[in-house]
Amino acid sequence: MDFISNKTPQIEAMLTEIGIQNVEELFKSIPSSLILQAPSVDDGLSEYEGIQLIESLAVRNTFPNLVSYLGAGAYEHHIPALVGAVCSKSEFLTAYTPYQAEASQGMLQIIFEFQSAICALTGMDVANASVYDGASACAEAILMSLRHHKTRRQILLSDSLHPHYKKVIEQYLKSQDCELITVPFLQEGTLDASFLKMYLNDQTAAILLQSPNFFGCIEDVQPITEMAKSQGALTILCANPISYGLLSSAKELGVDIAVGDCQPFGLSLSFGGPYAGYMACKQELMRQLPGRIVGETLDVQGSRGFVLTLQAREQHIRREKATSNICTNQALAALASLVAMLWYGKEGVKELALTNYQRANYLKFHLGKISTINVWNQGASFNEFVVDFKQDSNQVLEFFRLNGIEPGIELKRYYPSLKTCLLIAVTETKNQIQLDQFIKVCKELF
């Protein structure tokens, strides 16, 4: 097999066959400066020695011993055991793209059910089979709006959108003839609607905002969608899918395209991926929707069946005219999210969203009583919120870690002016004792 290296006798036999003395002679036509020098690597270890080495390295990782309040798009949620049990079935784990419908009914049904679940959450008419992640979903939604409004080349982008998402969008749009205008956020972390109104015009293809946004603030979306409609622009809403269990659906808010990351449902943190992004839209935008769409049909015997539909949009049909050049199937990650959604059910998702909301706002409320720090946005937050500790965040992190807590993410990574602020995330995995301990440590800090 080609990935098993040849032993010395085999190498010597091959060199003799072609009439040369050694391997160096085989490559003598290549300048020595271009030949990669073999790295200095120790001899191999036995299996047991290798296990000992890995375990000695793993012991140095103390993070699992900390109570983590990290969030910013990748959240610690409970993952039902059923998710792993279903996703580990070989017919899902190793399945190929279901081009051949008659041989792929199981996978096609899974994707169809995922699309149905996303439509139920968002209230939208159509959803696709997922994209890479929340960032690519945002970027693809912008491309949708540019295709829909062929002559409009302006995009208004909220600065309270996840910074990683903004970077991906900028990369996507580098080759597009369009103008990207960033709409700033107010001091409490919500979108500056007056700035938005100033730049919105008949050249605007779409407004993209996030709610709950990067800072956990719940935006007043409906007035923005109405403002966009007055100029004929589309509204793209990026949202944590769990938040729909508590907040108004995208359809109720008048949104045209709903996007986000499925990570909160059934996907482990996994160092940032792989995740799956969801995309859903109104029916009139359906033919601009990228990626695969599975439809329900009847076979020649009248039995229910599933097929890839509207394939003329896809790159394996139209190449450069396709709605997207995404070619990696995120169906396994989408399956994990689907299983989690079905495990919770409609009422369970509502309860999960309410629990996340209540626990985050409990911690936020009590931290707000500490006069030496400043909690952003006195209104409601979902999952996370910003605290200004009024001292360098490195010192704050060190103190909390000494007390067994990873308190949040330093916002100076993304916003240099916010060097004393942390973004703190609270999910259903944090109990009353842990939240009270966080408050206690925070008081001791000052």
Curated annotation (Swiss-Prot):
GO terms for molecular function: glycine dehydrogenase (decarboxylating) activity. It catalyses: N(6)-[(R)-lipoyl]-L-lysyl-[glycine-cleavage complex H protein] + glycine + H(+) = N(6)-[(R)-S(8)-aminomethyldihydrolipoyl]-L-lysyl-[glycine-cleavage complex H protein] + CO2. Keywords: Oxidoreductase. The keyword 4Fe-4S does not apply. Pfam families: GDC-P. It is an enzyme of class 1 (oxidoreductase). Its EC number is 1.4.4.2. HAMAP family: GcvPA (MF_00712). Belongs to the GcvP family. N-terminal subunit subfamily. The glycine cleavage system is composed of four proteins: P, T, L and H. In this organism, the P 'protein' is a heterodimer of two subunits. This is Probable glycine dehydrogenase (decarboxylating) subunit 1. It comes from Protochlamydia amoebophila (strain UWE25).
